[in-house]
């Protein structure tokens, strides 16, 4: 930990405990209390169809634990949430809960302008992530190459690390892509990408399994897909629970980067057209907003063959492993046959057995469209998974203390190793060839 972080004020407020306040048909007394701008609710939704009804109201779905969805609703969305007919329980003022997690003391000269509150300083902000990547290049110049896939809306470089035994050469080897922090508030995912980088560089000289995987693969790692959103989430010194990027659309600021991929985009009610919704895609009558990340994937088609074979998109939270399709409840659909679905589910099940999470097709959670998993598979036949990391439930939700970083990233080591081992030919896991 840097000296700057050790000198941060230690008097930040402790983690909040949300009060469970059930909704009643009537109220006992009129209240003069100000209506919260955002309220947390727990919704009982035991089927994918019920969860999809909730998601289509435009509320911010935070996570799932069993038959419970934790969501955040603005006042104008609450009537639609109640209209679903599902059991809804009020868990309190969301912004008050975020404030109670702590606030940075910007009067401390050692504190940067973009930093995490006390108890969270082990997380990397954008500049610290860049510093970490540059240090990796210095420490392992023969294993890594750092480049930018382009610029964010606000002009930040979208850094990507290539990990290979010959990083300056485009070798004829299966390529693997890891993406982290697509959603701004999911800070633990940056640490996951940095964990993979550290493990497969520092371990190269001493671990034969790691050496074999690095020697036989080209691994691309993008630790912070959405740096503008990340910096906005922590800019005030308290967490904002910001999900989207910072690119303006016609009605508000921000588009959900994981509802903005072109395959089956906007087809099935899997994202909101409301500008304030946390799953807002670009306007339905216009194409998805351009992003450098799909362009990079397209450039990996060499001689008519896509070089990237597999992909994991890291998210929090709910402790799930998901695979395509998200736009349909069907296990098979155009471009995804029974054998391919079996390979997806078999590898997903094997990985889940190693990190102790649940596994399911994406739409078994609820319908989504315009996602990276559906696009990578539907357009490029890249075996693409989402890992929803720790925690399982809304406590502590998106903001676990930094004391969990080591344990909750190391938890995925064996699953990542298995994933890389099958990245030359995923159907091998069901006894098929490529």
UniProtKB/Swiss-Prot annotation:
Q: Which GO terms describe its biological process?
A: proteolysis
Record's function text:
Carboxypeptidase that possesses the specificities of both mammalian Cpase A and B. Thus shows broad substrate specificity, being able to cleave Cbz-Gly-Leu, Cbz-Gly-Val, Cbz-Gly-Phe, Cbz-Gly-Lys and Bz-Gly-Arg in vitro.
Recorded hits in CDD domains, A to Z, give: M14_CPT (cd03859)
Q: Return the cofactor note field.
A: Binds 1 zinc ion per subunit.
Against PANTHER family, the record matches this protein to:
PROTEASE FAMILY M14 CARBOXYPEPTIDASE A,B (PTHR11705), SLL0236 PROTEIN (PTHR11705:SF143)
Which residues are the propeptide, according to the record?
34-114
Signal peptide location in the record?
Answer: 1-33
Q: Name one Pfam family in it.
A: Peptidase_M14
Please state every residue range assigned to the domain named Peptidase M14. Answer: 122-423
Annotated family = Belongs to the peptidase M14 family.
**Protein name from the UniProt record:** Zinc carboxypeptidase
Species source reads Saccharothrix mutabilis subsp. capreolus (Streptomyces capreolus)
Which residue positions are annotated as catalytic? Answer: 388
Q: Which cofactor does it need?
A: Zn(2+)
Basic residues bias located where? Answer: 282-293
